[in-house]
Regions:
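Conserved donor-binding/catalytic core segment of Leloir-type glycosyltransferases
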Residues: 175-184
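N-terminal subdomain of nucleotide-sugar transferases
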Residues: 1-44, 71
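Carbohydrate-associated surface elements
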Residues: 41, 142, 161
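A short, charged, and often flexible helix/loop element on the N-terminal side
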Residues: 40-71, 78, 118
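A short beta-strand/loop micro-motif in the catalytic core of glycosyltransferases
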Residues: 131-140, 156
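Nucleotide-sugar donor phosphate/pyrophosphate-binding loop at the beta->alpha transition
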Residues: 98-100, 107-128, 137-138, 164
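Short N-terminal targeting/anchoring amphipathic segment
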Residues: 64-85, 95-100
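Acidic anion/phosphate-binding donor-loop and adjacent secondary structure
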Residues: 162-176
């Protein structure tokens, strides 16, 4: 299957979104899928106000359309709600191409704390953005419940799992209760 993932979050950022997408692309490729990522590295960008590490693509639609047309994906995943995400959503809607989206961070709460924008306004935008997707993927049951509480009706869990190359639990050892009692 040919899968295209579109994201506004990418290197040089080091965060959970970037790590999740890299891991997802690696695992999908290992399963035999052909995966292409569209990231801000391919576009002219400007720094995000108040968060310059995030680069926002400038007018990405034409180049993104060319990438999508050339790749002809069987599946389109829109990972973020920024300029690239908006352009990918526009493309998919215009062509009646099904797509999925993801909700990675508590963006409305961040915008409210940083700029005083009411939660309801940001969640209204996010319902519009994600509402057209086949599914909006949430990382935890708590986030899924929060989105549903704010009126999202197409939320599914997309848990991250554990990287077994990094995390290897040691064998559990039987506790010697006779000896442990001497420490109490």
């Amino acid at each position: 299957m040919k899968i295209m993932i579109v994201t506004d979050a990418w290197e040089p950022q080091v965060n959970g979104v970037v790590r999740t997408l890299k891991s997802t692309a690696r695992e999908l490729t290992a399963l035999g899928h052909r995966v292409e990522l569209v990231t801000p590295l391919e576009f002219r960008t400007v720094p995000c106000p108040t968060y310059p590490e995030i680069r926002l693509s400038i007018l990405p639609y034409r180049r993104l359309r060319e990438r999508l047309d050339a790749f002809e994906p069987h599946a389109l995943h829109i990972a973020t709600e920024g300029p690239l995400g908006l352009a990918a959503r526009r493309y998919a809607r215009a062509r009646k191409l099904p797509f999925t989206t993801a909700y990675h961070t508590r963006f409305p709460e961040y915008v409210q704390a940083r700029f005083g924008v009411p939660l309801a306004a940001t969640y209204r935008f996010l319902r519009w953005f994600h509402g057209a997707s086949l599914a909006v993927m949430a990382p935890t049951p708590v986030v899924k419940d929060d989105l549903e509480r704010f009126g999202f009706d197409n939320v599914v869990l997309w848990t991250r799992g554990v990287d077994l190359d990094i995390f290897r639990p040691i064998e559990s050892k039987v506790l010697n209760t006779a000896r442990a009692g001497s420490y109490l």
